[in-house]
Structure formats: structure tokens, C-alpha cells
């Protein structure tokens, strides 16, 4: 799972 803000 990759989260980019």
C-alpha cells in the first residue's frame, strides 16, 4: 500500500 500526500 502506497500513500502519497
Curated annotation (Swiss-Prot):
Q: Which GO terms describe its cellular component?
A: extracellular region
Q: Which UniProt keywords apply?
A: Amidation, Amphibian defense peptide, Secreted
What tissues is it present in? Expressed by the skin glands.
SS bonds (residue pairs): none
Q: In its UniProt record, which GO terms are filed under biological process?
A: defense response
Give the modified residues of type Histidine amide. 5
Cellular compartments annotated: Secreted
Which protein is depicted?
Electrin-4
What is the originating organism of this protein? Litoria rubella
Amino acid at each position: 500500500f502506497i500513500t502519497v500526500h
